[in-house]
């Protein structure tokens, strides 16, 4: 998200599909996207009880065929109420910028970008640092436009989480960056 760098490169995670260069297949964020109503639901225990569950849900909520609405209600259960999404991207002139969004802004932009498009994102590698109730994850993902199609892009998302004694919460999707020919992913993010 959006939210891996892919989704999130797409958005995303994630993470509103942001790509450094437009290949003609990328999905760009919508500046004036319509507001998406997000119903309040209870979190799924399997999503929030482990770091693996959190990451699995993080990518699943943005993935699906073109005719399937994204799971924004499930997505909202993963985050603290005031979570921020900070997306790193490079414009066509090569200038790198950071864009900060609320969850609602992320959803509005992502939903508009993903509507009517098949998008599948999943984790391929993770670096985890944990100290007590705090965890920092660097999650590498790849995305495709079909569940069995060729990889179209990869990205790295930086997720900060905390354990409240009963469940994990994502407090910040601090950065994600999408791989490009100018910025290939380093080996440590792939194996």
Where are these regions (language model features)?
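Surface-exposed, charged secondary-structure patches
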Residues: 84-85, 93-150
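Sec-dependent N-terminal signal peptides
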Residues: 2-21
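Acidic helix-start/capping segments at beta-turn-to-alpha-helix junctions
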Residues: 72-84, 88-95
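Extracytoplasmic
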Residues: 78-80, 132, 156
């Amino acid at each position: 998200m959006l939210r891996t760098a892919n989704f999130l490169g797409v958005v995303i995670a994630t993470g509103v599909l942001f790509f450094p260069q437009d290949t003609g297949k990328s999905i760009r964020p919508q500046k004036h996207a319509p507001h998406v109503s997000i119903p309040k639901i209870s979190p799924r225990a399997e999503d929030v009880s482990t770091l693996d569950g959190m990451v699995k849900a993080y990518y699943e909520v943005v993935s699906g065929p073109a005719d399937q609405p994204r799971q924004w209600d499930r997505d909202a259960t993963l985050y603290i109420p005031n979570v921020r999404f900070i997306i790193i991207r490079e414009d066509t002139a090569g200038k790198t910028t950071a864009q900060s969004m609320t969850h609602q802004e992320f959803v509005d932009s992502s939903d508009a970008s993903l509507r009517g498009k098949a998008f599948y994102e999943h984790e391929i590698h993770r670096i985890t640092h944990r100290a007590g109730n705090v965890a920092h994850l660097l999650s590498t993902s790849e995305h495709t436009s079909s569940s069995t199609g060729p990889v179209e892009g990869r990205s790295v998302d930086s997720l900060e989480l905390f354990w409240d004694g009963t469940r994990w919460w994502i407090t910040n999707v601090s950065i994600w960056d999408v791989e490009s020919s100018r910025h290939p992913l380093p080996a440590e993010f792939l194996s």
